């Protein structure tokens, strides 16, 4: 930290280091994203042992293409952040300019800056959504969805690209209150009411069991099944082979 402080005219570094007595700053890295410089600080703080009372003891969440996140209580989040009109306009402008010219280089820099803006927007929304999910439940159960493979097996590559599915999954996996079920659990097919297995096509949005006549939204059904499978196996011997506790 002191090395970067001496090398750069950082405003407010002294005030930052004195902000809290329980913060121990260890390292600082100077990062350049092609437009701006940032200082990334690594620090340690005392663990917060406060016990928070949350709305739900446990929820299951299903990640999907149609709805980004579906919770077992019926709450849905549909988030898509695509290319901005400003970016599209800049790309059209670039096509009409001579490659390597001053104007071309200026437009390229503006495009890079707009891409960074979109990335920051996606990160901000993902952080807020994950914080919201963690604040409403003591335990979150999700499945190890292979999001990248959805690009090859569906016609929704653009929608997946504009979503924040990967960011949500990655950020949730850092929490010790998130349980990740193996991808092979039949959360969509299985009827926890009677044990029947029913295969659904991607465009089938309702799960209706032909045996017990249970009828439920497909994604809510899958999210509830995640809780069901977790509760069935969490105390069994050999659970570590089928259940990933992050």
Located regions from the model:
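Acidic carboxylate diad motif detector
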Residues: 1-31, 162
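Positively charged, helix-rich recognition surfaces that bind polyanionic ligands
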Residues: 34-246
């Amino acid at each position: 930290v002191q090395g970067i402080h001496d090398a750069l005219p950082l405003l407010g570094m002294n005030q930052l280091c004195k902000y809290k007595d329980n913060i121990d700053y260890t390292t600082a890295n100077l990062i350049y994203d092609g437009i701006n410089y940032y200082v990334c600080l690594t620090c340690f703080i005392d663990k917060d042992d406060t016990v928070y009372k949350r709305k739900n003891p446990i929820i299951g969440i299903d990640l999907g293409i149609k709805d980004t996140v579906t919770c077992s209580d019926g709450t849905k989040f549909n988030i898509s952040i695509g290319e901005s009109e400003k970016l599209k306009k800049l790309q059209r402008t670039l096509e009409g300019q001579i490659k390597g010219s001053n104007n071309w280089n200026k437009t390229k820099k503006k495009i890079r800056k707009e891409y960074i803006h979109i990335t920051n927007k996606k990160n901000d929304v993902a952080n807020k959504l994950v914080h919201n999910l963690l604040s409403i439940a003591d335990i979150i159960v999700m499945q190890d969805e292979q999001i990248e493979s959805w690009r090859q097996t569906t016609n929704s590559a653009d929608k997946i690209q504009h979503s924040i599915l990967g960011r949500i999954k990655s950020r949730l996996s850092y929490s010790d209150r998130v349980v990740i079920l193996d991808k092979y659990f039949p959360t969509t097919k299985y009827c926890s009411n009677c044990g029947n297995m029913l295969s659904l096509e991607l465009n089938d949005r309702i799960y209706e069991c032909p045996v017990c006549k249970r009828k439920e939204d497909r994604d809510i059904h899958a999210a509830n099944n995640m809780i069901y499978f977790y509760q069935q196996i969490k105390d069994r011997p050999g659970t570590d082979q089928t259940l990933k506790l992050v």
